[in-house]
Amino acid sequence: MKNYFKKVAMAMLLLAMANVCAARQWHVNNYMGIKADFASIDAAMASEEVVEGDTIYIGAGCMLGSQTISKKVTVIGTGWGYSDSPATVAKINGNVTITAQGAKVVGLYVSGVCNINVHDVVLERCQIVSGIKQGTGDQVNDVKIFSCRTVYIIASSTNYRWEIKNNLILDGGEKYGSLQNLYYATIENNIVRTNSGINRYGYFAYKCNYCIFKNNVLFAGTSDIGQVEQAYFFTNSSNTTIKNNVISLPSTYESAWPGNVFTNSTDITQVFKCTGSVAGGEYYSLCEGSPAIDAGEGSIDCGVMVGAYKFVPYGRPDNIPVIKQLMVPDSPTNDQINVTVEF
């Protein structure tokens, strides 16, 4: 009997190893002179060779239009925000639509919107310039958005258990705010600036029900006469826990939302260093004496620099070298071409 169980265990181990070994890595690039398996994500999705569990790397210099991720794969970009040179980064100059349950996207720059149409999607370390949306009226559950930069996250009324952690959600232009229509979601250790600036009123959260908001730094805009905009936090939101956040409202709101820190100002320099790079993490690091220090649950800091999914500078994927600078001369010198690469 003991030998039987040993054989069963060995068979299970071999099967697991076979599944791991079966997963393949693919490279996508359309940059001139770069050899790759496919010229676009769409082309990779159309290939019968690319299967569930594979990893697709988008190489430096790759510039694509709108793409659809239609298989349960992991798509890994180059990170974002560290260089203006097209030869050093990969970009999606359009929208990304995810239609495969269980797909994961890491370190990708998207100039448009990311439409999430299925359950169990993970976005990590991405910059989604024009916002993250639930792209369908069908129910979409268990989405995870970690350590990204975007302008808003908008779901529909049919979603549950989204996790939104350690993101920069900055200056959303939507009428109804930076976070919308979330149910039973966890919103934790984010920095949210909703419609910052004069005479820009947008709601911070609209129809966010049965959610948990904790360890965030939440800043609204100001009115046209410079007053702190008070009326549009957590509008039409019910049964929501709001605790251990730093919020740009007067302390008179303590009775409504006890256990938070109220700054009575939209001056973010009292909370953050406000120097250096946003993408690199310096700008939104906490300044000396910041009210966000130790203000989180368990006396951790509020904001994006702590926690299991703390903000990663430039959205760098793990174990992927970042090319900060690439200099290639137009012509050789003394029959040699000297290429300079800075990592």
What are these regions (language model features)?
Residues 24-63:
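Acidic Gly/Asp/Thr-rich repetitive segments characteristic of extracellular carbohydrate-active
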Residues 64-66, 72-116, 125-132, 153:
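Right-handed parallel beta-helix/beta-spiral solenoid domain characteristic of secreted/periplasmic
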Residues 302-337, 342:
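Short, compositionally biased P/S/T/A/G/V-rich stretches that sit at domain boundaries
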